[in-house]
Amino acid sequence: MEFSEKWLLDWLGFSISNVFYEQMTKSGIEVEAIAKISKNFERVIVGEVVERLYVNTMHNIVFLRVKLSEKKMIFSISSNDIEFSRGTKIAIATQDSKLFNNRLISMLRFKEKISEGMVCSFKDLGILNIKNKIVEICSEVPVGTDISKFLWFDDDRIIKVSSAPNRADGMSILGIARDMSALNNLCLPTLKEYHINITNHEKFRILINIPDVCLNFIGRTIQSVNLNRQTPLWILERLRRSSISSENVLVDIINYVLIELGQPIFSFNIHGIVQNIIIRTARDNEQFFDSCSQRVPIDKRTILLSDDKEILVLGNHTNSYNSRLSLSSHNIFLGCALFNPEYINNDSHFNFGFKNKITEYYSRGVDSDIQYKALNYVTYLVLKICGGNASNVVLANSSRVTVIQKKIFVLKKTLHRYVNNIISDTLVVKYLLQLGYLVEKQKHCWLVIPPSWRFDIQIQEDVISDLVRVFGYHNIPACALVTNYKLVHDDNIYTSLNRIKLLLVDLGYNEVITYSFVDSQIQKYLFPKRKQFFLLNPISRKMSSMRLSLWNGLLSSVLYNQNRQEKVMRFFESGLCFEEDGNEYLGVKQDLYLAGVISGYKNETDWRSFNKIVSFYDLKGDIELIMALLRKLDKVSFKKMLFQNLCPKQSAAIYFEREMIGVIGVISSNISKKMGLKYKTIVFELIWKKIAQSNDYRIRDVSLYPRCSRDISIIVNDSIAADEILKVSKNVFLDKIVEVKLFDVFYGKNVGLNKKSLSLRFIFGSSKRTLSEEIISNCLNECIRILQEKFNAILRDRNFLF
């Protein structure tokens, strides 16, 4: 936000120095830059039109007699396209003047008259790039006054500030003036009340169909306005110094009030008699065309204003084609809304259409106490400049939701714990009253109600931080930090995790560290049915939600590297994730996760290997290596399970014994397309706590006797998981079978439709004796019999048929 220093001074009762701006930055409204006003002209003065003499149609100029002082009168020229009336005060450039681009004025002789000056347009002075708009001066300014003094070119500066997303008061001159007045122990500035003469008795109703979102709405109509009037120079210049260009007089007035008060005002053209103004959301298949007749996409969550027939304006103040304002508009509607920031900050609930500056004001919160005054202020300026007949203000309150000022208890012990007993009870009450709070002192606490412009004050810690701002951070003595955290030391968890990280690095993975706050839209793609936790004060929109999974950061890393022509991508990350749990503190549970992703090719291009795309089994093998290192592979299984964000036939749940500990699968094509992933991408995620806490270290003797292996091939239905067959095989004669491995899977015509051939290797051994061929054969036959009974397995080797 940018504004004129003089504009801010109008609201303050004291002078400004650089110390003031340091104080502003410390208070939470950061001063980014202070710049002097660039003046593109010199010695241009105020003159008064006395008489219009004659017109030179050939050169399209008009001669004027202009009064520069009580004793001096000159002839001046101007474009014939501009109308002049007697007594109009204008900017005059004489022979001593220097205009924009160092242009000088020369005398012009015509019909024995010599022109000694020129009427200046905004373009001549380098203020606005509008050639046929002359600079009109208000009648109170004496003739002969230097224009630069009238416009404060010599002693004004442009201030650029930014405030935190939760500070709605930092987006207006009034809000900044309030904050700085409180910090300097001065009375808070108040908005002047303007009395409006009611000369228009048109009646209409305002209906709120979304009471949870729109808390109230006020509006009025003004008839017979003249929008061809020129915006006063003092408004134009203040807008220019706020980097806002002029459109028309009504838009200029509304922008002026927006910057000064932080109050957005709806304005649109009305045709005939309006009976109802309805605040609602868009209907199914409803279309909206803006003032340029361009179609704007809207949906059932889009907030808008309509009459009984059509949409008039979107919630972001985008007028429809039929309600657009033009210089020929005579009847207008002005309105002011109070929206609930809790609903509109979350895009999944409601929106105003496309985002713009207006939506930022609404998302931060609008001061409900000055709505009526702000509407009257705009009305006053419109009537003064453009004329017209104003109606009464019509008010509509939400039927189910009212504006309730939040009551907060600030405990003395909490305050003293943070600031170490250095702010007395008397100062607490004094500072809170300075800041605009309502305060009631009680025995062990203060009951406070925040001011209407501070939507960010929610808990007692917010109030305490406000107190410290006024008291001064430099006055708080430094002391050692005291925490109430109970740290649970479980070195085994982190030792195991560090060991696994080394393994993954050896396998070609790179560790990434990403923020715990992620893009809510990407997270919605991945987990459409899971509840998200949104931040009230996000750093940016791409960091607005707490992560439910590590996949958000990993997929973003893949996308980043993919866009830089990387083709071998293997990443892993460990960190906390957050999910809803009513039994936990604040209803949020956090767990440590380990996750990984592979995408692109298996290896770099090399003469020894082919460019092979990664597959599901590549990542499954890496997970099995992790489990083997943790000595848990024999208790881990992969079971088919459907996940919305993964491909149905290439995803599985990972189980440790009977408990689900993770997920593995290929990212679905739908999500890959939305995110722009070029290659097949496979991910996994493990709840680390569930597998790291139960490490069993058992000592056993190494067998002195030789081992023997046997291979078999069986045919089973394709729907039977190989893991189930391995489990059953391992449970047969556990004291003799050392290991069972699957070393081949085969599909073919000879096997049969919906059938598959599995080749198993049995490794027999005993720690007590050497197993004879008879014992090994009996064990293997028993295992085959059980497989036949349980899975209808067919042995491919006929020597083992019964």
Curated annotation (Swiss-Prot):
It catalyses: tRNA(Phe) + L-phenylalanine + ATP = L-phenylalanyl-tRNA(Phe) + AMP + diphosphate + H(+). Mg(2+) binds at D456, D462, D466. GO terms for biological process: phenylalanyl-tRNA aminoacylation. CDD domains: PheRS_beta_core, tRNA_bind_bactPheRS. Residues 703-796 form the FDX-ACB domain. One of its GO terms (molecular function) is tRNA binding. Tetramer of two alpha and two beta subunits. PANTHER family: PHENYLALANINE--TRNA LIGASE BETA SUBUNIT, PHENYLALANYL-TRNA SYNTHETASE BETA CHAIN AND LEUCINE-RICH REPEAT-CONTAINING PROTEIN 47. This is Phenylalanine--tRNA ligase beta subunit. Residues 38-148 form the tRNA-binding domain. InterPro entries: aa-tRNA-synth_II/BPL/LPL, B3/B4_tRNA-bd, DNA-bd_dom_put_sf, Fdx_antiC-bd, Fdx_antiC-bd_sf, NA-bd_OB-fold, Phe-tRNA-ligase_IIc_bsu, Phe-tRNA-ligase_IIc_bsu_bact. It is found in: Cytoplasm. The keyword Protein biosynthesis applies. Its main location: cytoplasm. Its cofactor is Mg(2+). Belongs to the phenylalanyl-tRNA synthetase beta subunit family. Type 1 subfamily. NCBIfam families: pheT_bact. Transmembrane segments: none annotated. GO terms for cellular component: phenylalanine-tRNA ligase complex. The gene is pheT. Residues 403-478 form the B5 domain. Binds 2 magnesium ions per tetramer.
